[in-house]
Amino acid sequence: MKNKYPLPIMIIHWLTLFLVVLAYTTGGDPTVHLKTGELHVFAGISVFLLFLIRIIIISIYRKDIPLNKPRSKYQRTLFLMVKYTLYSLLFLIPVLGWVTLSGLTESYQLFAISLPLISNSWDVEIIGEVHEFLGNSFMVLIGFHALAALIHHYVFKDNVLKSMLYFKK
Ligand code: HEM
Ligand code: HEM
């Protein structure tokens, strides 16, 4: 068992953070705010594609994932709950964004490429609100996740944060 995450998983992890922050800071109706909207949709779709790649890469490197020993069984349950909630949101938020966009316009050009949209008769306003709510909740959860990593590093002084950092020995 290694004490660091494999490099491809580290790259996906930190690239996802960058893209989520980009998606969050460019949030808004992409059919109104054209330039930032394009960045929003690009970052959001990239998060979704990276999520799919992440699942494949993690299953390939299954045996090389560090076993950061939990301090108690409650901590392990909490870690797994946060992990699977993050996973679900990485999937759900972009999909809801895409459904909302499909209801707001009949065609959408992303860097001159026509994005495939679905025709639907759902209440786009509500789906848009849910997308926004989950987007905001996601940032709060990431904040807790990051805080936990920092507490591990500075208070418990263990290997958890270092296991996701390339440079730190
Ligand atoms: C991790 C990915 C994403 C995050 C964190 C995110 C977050 C957000 C947030 C917070 C808003 C509300 C902004 C505001 O009104 O102040 C928003 C709006 C919106 N997003 Fe996303 N988004 C993501 C991905 C996507 C994707 C992939 C699409 C489309 C393919 C999309 C389409 C939209 C649309 C259409 C709105 C406007 C909703 C409305 O006005 O009702 N988003 N997004
Ligand atoms: C978009 C933001 C983030 C997402 C979606 C995210 C998601 C995840 C996920 C799902 C894992 C479990 C490993 C895996 O399946 O890849 C993980 C592990 C980890 N993350 Fe994040 N993370 C984010 C941001 C951060 C930040 C800002 C920090 C630190 C400041 C951080 C530190 C860590 C550490 C140290 C681990 C290893 C935990 C362990 O194995 O015990 N993450 N992250």
Residue ranges and their predicted role:
Residues 1-169:
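Membrane-embedded alpha-helical bundles that constitute the cytochrome b-like, heme-associated redox core
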